[in-house]
Regions:
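Active-site beta->alpha loop and helix N-cap motifs at the rims of alpha/beta catalytic domains
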Residues: 1-126, 143
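Catalytic alpha/beta core domains of metabolic enzymes, predominantly
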Residues: 105, 109-112, 119-201
Length: 201
């Protein structure tokens, strides 16, 4: 990875006065990184981000133990929010997916908010709205969802959630206005045009 480029990118994001920085969430790219590279990216962002900017780290890994290793690194770097992804290669049914996330969330610090990336259109495994609500009821720290869908798809799902279960849309900022209108708390866009998306927000 290009350390200098990443440092410059973080400083650029700081200059935009955004609310937070998220990393390791682009599945097509993050799965090409080694564990050491993931750790380095987390450390760089933790070091260079603005003091009052939230740090969100996506946790991926095929095995329970892989994700726990990365969670320890995230906790050591004072992540505010962890976004858990289901395994990328293996397709899990709703029950298996819920069990997987249950086993992970039990081991997350009580000082760290946690959510899941729920993207049925993009990931092999996802949770039903009912399973999302089970996690919400079981864990006081489970208060966020990173959705990946059109505003039309997300609208009825958001309506079924409690008001303090916040949904952020992804998809690089597509449909930002529509996403905000249906009740998304915000979006998690790509960096390239975050300045314009921040103005729209």
């Amino acid at each position: 990875i290009d350390i200098k480029f990443l440092e410059d990118e973080i400083k650029l994001i700081n200059s935009l006065n955004v609310k937070g920085i998220a990393c390791l969430g682009l599945g097509t790219e993050v799965n090409k990184l080694s564990f050491k590279e993931k750790v380095k990216i987390i450390e760089l962002i933790s070091k260079y981000k603005s003091k009052n900017t939230y740090l969100t780290i996506t946790i991926s890994g095929e095995k329970y133990t892989d994700q726990l290793k990365l969670i320890k690194v995230a906790n050591a770097n004072k992540a505010d929010w962890l976004v858990l992804q289901p395994p990328a290669k293996k397709k899990l049914n709703d029950r298996e997916c819920l069990d997987f996330f249950n086993s992970i969330i039990k081991n997350v610090s009580n000082n760290t908010f946690v959510g899941v990336q729920n993207a049925p259109e993009y990931l092999k495994s996802s949770l039903s709205p009912n399973s999302i609500l089970k996690l919400y009821k079981n864990y006081k720290t489970f208060r966020y969802i990173k959705g990946e869908g059109t505003a039309k798809i997300l609208a009825p799902i958001i309506k079924s959630y409690p008001k303090d279960l916040k949904v952020f849309n992804g998809r690089a900022g597509l449909e930002i206005i529509e996403s905000l209108k249906i009740g998304c708390e915000g979006i998690m866009p790509s960096v390239e045009f975050s300045d314009k998306l921040n103005e729209i927000y």
